[in-house]
Amino acid sequence: MKLSFVISLLLAASFAAYAQQAMPRMTSVEPQNGKVGDVVVVTGENLQKDTVAKLYLTDGKIDVEVSITEQSGKEIKFKIPAKCKPGRLALMVLTGGKEPKLIEQPVKITIDEQ
């Protein structure tokens, strides 16, 4: 009986620790089309600096890091970097914390020709 209680406590503690690691989730990007140098605003949840360490634009083969100009829990602003090629690109985050992960987000932006 005591053993099952201890196991239950350990499981509850591990689930609580896991739940505290909030995962970033992007829900929209404005504008949906842009050119190099344009400012882009991404909205979502858990976008603060401790959960989103870096932000990339990716076509699935080439990842281009963007320079974040403003960042809060619900919004990230960045400029489209000169290295971006025209096309439809996904946003991808590098999470913060002890075990960083690259996570492609369900939002995309189209980079137009100059």
Regions found by a protein language model. Give the residues of each.
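Hydrophobic h-region of N-terminal signal peptides that target proteins for export
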Residues: 10-19
